[in-house]
Curated annotation (Swiss-Prot):
Record-given protein name: Protein O-mannosyl-transferase tmem260
Species whose genome carries this gene: Dictyostelium discoideum
UniProt-annotated location(s): Endoplasmic reticulum membrane
Transmembrane parts of this sequence: 113-133, 152-172, 185-205, 210-230, 232-252, 285-305, 316-336, 391-411, 427-447, 459-479, 505-525
InterPro entries given in the database record: GT117_domain-containing, TMEM260-like
Secretion signal, residue range per the UniProt entry: none
Taxon lineage: Eukaryota, Amoebozoa, Evosea, Eumycetozoa, Dictyostelia
A Pfam family annotated for this UniProt entry: TMEM260-like
Length: 819
């Protein structure tokens, strides 16, 4: 806005000259000087200059002061520029803008309060009706454990979430509701507050409740948002802070505009809104660091564009710094918590300055990395394509079209035509593009793998806040455009009537239909109220363990879910659960190992290749004679030291670690046969539409299948080379186990291949050990051949990605051709 006057506070520019222009003649309409008469004869004047009356605070006689018409007109244009109102589509009549001016300092009118209450109650009720009844997958188990115990979460700590989670998990007086449900309910309520901020943003922007409700509901009940806001995760609060910053930007802009036209007697001046914005930016960063990608463009716009003439003085800057530090204060909990409340499964040694900085900067993962391993090389274009495809899933074609119209209106409207790049709409577009380009370039997740693709998708929620806001702007743009067409083509009377009817009936009907479709289409897909699968999975891991077992775990699912049941719901208090991931950090010896009195740690850290480190073999040697040791999930990669002295026998979802010198004491076939007969049986979420391959439910089913594959692998290693009755039974048992594995995941390549191997060996043994004239044996061998052919054909057709790594690939193809 190169031609717009500099914004300044009305306190400094108020006119105290009560005699200026008060006696001007009423016939000066055509006079080129800038003094205009406030005489009542000007009511019929057709010129477009608008008289502004400013109340003089020092005038006890309430004398009216006339403001210069040119200044008034320029201020009006400036207002439209800042809010993208001057683009010819989202257009306001002067009288409408005057009404907004009169009400700008009073956001919470009765109608607004009614919409806020409606949003909060409806969203919270629907969310609570569809929540997980207990623990869910991913990081939720760990975050709930840490929040309930008031510990420190994985880097960067999430102190705001854990603090509020601790309050919610203890303040709700109910023994029937699980700890996980209580913290998930907190997320649901916070998600409802995010919806309120989205509504207020759009409402303050276009002055239409229905447009605000459309944006709020479409966002709240989009599949991705719904999924993560009904479980104990940090994303719900992060969405709330993104929406809050959008709201504060619009609010600050409006108050600044109208402070130039009259003295603001309300509490919330633009200066105080700036302080609130600083506090909100800071406290939002104590929940999740990805908010910084929204904070950076927002803070730049606030300090260097919209408030550059107001906020750059020592007093205000000092206050902004003060409120920023207050907002960051929850990070003090990372210092205090380890000293006052040492609990199991709490991360880091944050009680020291070095430990705090290391945790805050996520140095253990890589400060600017989401993934600690070697991520896949995926182009930015591919990632953006995935995002656009996902937008269609989230909002449908109509919702995406409305968002596109809203974005184009901001991008190609008055801003570009007159280079008004300083508007709030421009800031929103820049924030969206900044997040998309910066984060997608930063993301090093191997998204070619389904589970990590799901992790990648959850970071779409922040830009989706902006997309939902532009949806409300888009539908308002359409109706504004239709209004202009009718205004240009009809008489004044008919136009007014038509516009009124459109606004009053058609807009609400369309919005109700869109919102109803969004909720109705996604409700069943997001309803997790009966999903006890993770709860049952955790019990299946823990319930079969012998008394006083030491359970080593590796992997998020097999760690977080059993840990939640053990520490929050006090399941199996006799056992100890140790995460091999946490054992490998240097701080474990200081903060965690003292809490495990019955466990011996033969060094400072679980790392076989550093001084004072120890290997898994050293750890097992120190503890194997004291208690049973089981492993759940995977061993730590890079440490094979134990393999010469220990082996494992699969027992359900875990495996017992046994010294090889004691192997004669165990009959592998009988043990696996017994445990397979009692293999966990619970409701499996096998609805592929509801639980696609990037969901934690699908990953859990894969873990179930892998546990069965481990049992079959143990049998095959021991019995495949043997030629006796027990080995034949072991092969038959392996077939049963692998066929069950395929009921969980029907395209498990390892199972398909080794089923063929089992049938090949069974066929060979039948043919070799019985008389060829035995028809029953021949039929049995023929059946084995058919089964071999079926599974190996399926393996070749479905597992083409194994061709370059499987040395048996060509052999299997030749066998298929021969049979």
């Amino acid at each position: 806005m190169n031609n717009s006057p500099t914004l300044s506070n009305t306190r400094n520019r108020k006119n105290n000259n009560n005699n200026s222009n008060s006696n001007s003649n009423s016939n000066n309409n055509n006079n080129n000087n800038n003094n205009n008469n406030n005489n009542s004869n000007n009511n019929n004047n057709n010129n477009n200059n608008v008289n502004r009356n400013v109340n003089n605070r020092n005038n006890n006689n309430n004398n009216i002061i006339n403001v210069n018409n040119n200044v008034s007109s320029t201020t009006m244009n400036m207002a439209k520029d800042f809010m993208n109102w001057n683009d010819g589509i989202i257009e306001r009549e002067d009288t409408q803008l005057q009404q907004q001016k009169d009400r700008c300092f009073k956001i919470l009118k009765k109608s607004t309060i009614a919409c806020i209450v409606l949003l909060f109650i409806s969203c919270t009720i629907i969310y609570s009706m569809t929540q997980y009844p207990s623990v869910s997958g991913g990081d939720a188990g760990e975050l709930i454990v840490v929040a309930h115990q008031f510990g420190v979460a994985h880097p960067p700590g999430y102190p705001l979430f854990t603090f509020l989670g601790y309050i919610f998990s203890h303040i709700i007086p109910s023994n029937t509701l699980s700890v996980a449900w209580k913290i998930s309910f907190m997320s649901s309520m916070i998600g409802s507050i995010a919806s309120i901020f989205i509504y207020l943003t759009v409402y303050l922007w276009v002055n239409n409740h229905w447009c605000g409700l459309l944006s709020a509901y479409m966002f709240t009940f989009s599949p991705l948002i719904w999924m993560y806001q009904i479980q104990g995760e940090v994303f719900s609060m992060n969405n709330m802070f993104v929406a809050m910053l959008m709201f504060l930007g619009v609010w600050y802009t409006r108050v600044r505009i109208f402070e130039n036209e009259r003295y603001n007697t309300a509490f919330w001046t633009s200066e105080r809104i700036a302080y609130l914005s600083a506090f909100s930016c800071a406290i939002g960063l104590t929940n999740q660091h990805t908010l910084v990608l929204i904070v950076i463009p927002f803070a730049f716009w606030l300090m260097f564009i919209s408030g550059r003439d107001q906020l750059w003085n020592i007093k205000i800057l000092s206050n902004l710094v003060f409120y920023t530090l207050i907002g960051l204060s929850p990070y003090l909990l990372l210092f205090i918590t380890p000293k006052l409340n040492r609990v199991k499964y709490s991360w880091g040694n944050t009680s020291t300055l070095r430990g705090f900085i290391k945790h805050f900067l996520r140095e253990e993962y890589g400060t600017l990395q989401l993934y600690g391993g070697d991520g896949g090389v995926i182009s930015l274009f591919t990632k953006i394509s995935i995002y656009i495809e996902n937008l269609i899933i989230q909002f449908g074609y109509i919702g995406l079209a409305l968002s596109l119209i809203g974005l184009l209106n901001l991008l190609l409207g008055y801003n570009i035509r007159t280079f008004k790049w300083k508007s709030f709409g421009t800031m929103i577009i820049f924030s969206f593009l900044f997040y998309i380009t910066f984060f997608f370039n930063l993301c090093n997740l191997p998204i070619d793998k389904p589970l990590y693709r799901g992790v990648f998708l959850r970071f779409f929620m922040q830009p989706n806040v902006i997309i939902s806001i532009t949806m409300g702007l888009g539908i308002k743009s359409i109706f504004g455009f239709l209004n202009r067409i009718q205004r240009d083509g009809g008489t004044a009377a008919t136009t007014t009537t038509t516009i009124s009817k459109i606004q009053k009936y058609l807009l609400p009907i369309i919005i109700i239909l869109l919102v109803g479709n969004q909720i109705g289409f996604n409700y069943n897909l997001q309803d997790q109220s009966d999903n006890y699968s993770f709860y049952d999975y955790g019990h299946s891991v823990l319930d079969g363990l012998p008394r006083n077992t030491l359970l080593l775990v590796g992997g998020d699912l097999v760690t977080n879910v059993p840990m939640y049941l053990h520490l929050c719901e006090k399941v199996r208090p006799d056992i100890d659960i140790l995460s091999m991931e946490i054992m490998s950090w240097e701080w474990f010896k200081i903060t965690q190992s003292p809490l495990f009195q019955r466990v011996k740690f033969p060094g400072n850290v679980y790392h076989p290749y550093i001084p004072d480190g120890y290997s898994l073999k050293d750890f097992l040697d120190a503890n194997i004679n004291d208690r049973p040791i089981y492993i759940g999930g995977d061993f730590k990669s890079g440490d094979s030291s134990f393999q010469n002295d220990y082996y494992t026998i699969s027992k359900g979802l875990t495996s017992q670690i046994i010294p090889k010198k004691d192997s004669h004491k165990f009959n592998t076939f009988k043990i696996i046969k017994t445990t397979f007969s009692t293999f966990p049986s619970f409701h499996i979420p096998n609805n592929t539409e509801k639980y696609p391959n990037d969901s934690w439910e699908h990953f859990m089913m894969e873990e179930m299948a892998v546990s069965l594959e481990r049992a079959a692998e143990t049998l095959l290693k021991e019995y495949l080379s043997q030629q006796n009755t027990e080995s034949f039974k072991a092969l038959e048992l392996s077939v049963e186990i692998l066929e069950k594995a395929l009921t969980y995941v029907n395209d498990k390549c390892w199972s398909l291949k080794h089923l063929g191997i089992c049938f090949d060996h069974l066929r060979y043994r039948v043919v070799q050990n019985v008389n060829n004239n035995n028809q029953q044996a021949q039929n049995k061998a023929s059946n084995y051949s058919k089964q071999l052919l079926y599974f190996w054909k399926k393996y070749i057709n479905q597992c083409t990605h194994e061709e370059n790594t499987d040395q048996d690939w060509e052999t299997i193809k030749k066998v298929i051709q021969l049979i």
